[in-house]
């Protein structure tokens, strides 16, 4: 499937997607696709740590050691409703299965 996707996706689109950051720090929030690897400093997280693993499905993980009170906001592991668990918030509520999309605005 991945190979077929690369065949049909125009090269400029693929280049754009590959050029995007895998982690964004925005104030007290850290935004990633799949969370962050527990007990690994943010500065040492790999691309794979941030976009592929299912560690976000495991509750009570120890946060990255240099999180400094920030909150990791991620998806990748479908949940029925957004779930806040200590140092992380999972906002993947299966938007690809026509239900609803979680949207967060700036803090008031």
Predicted regions and their residues:
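Short, charged, surface-exposed secondary-structure boundary motifs
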Residues: 98-107
């Amino acid at each position: 499937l991945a190979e077929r996707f690369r065949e049909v996706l125009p090269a400029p689109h693929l280049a754009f997607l590959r050029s995007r950051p895998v982690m964004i720090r925005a104030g007290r929030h850290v935004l990633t696709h799949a969370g962050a690897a527990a007990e690994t400093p943010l500065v040492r997280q790999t691309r794979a740590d941030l976009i592929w693993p299912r560690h976000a499905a495991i509750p009570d993980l120890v946060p990255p050691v240099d999180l400094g009170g920030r909150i990791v906001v991620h998806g990748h592991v479908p949940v029925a409703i957004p779930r806040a668990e200590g140092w992380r918030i999972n906002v993947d509520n299966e938007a690809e299965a026509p239900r609803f999309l979680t949207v967060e605005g700036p803090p008031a």
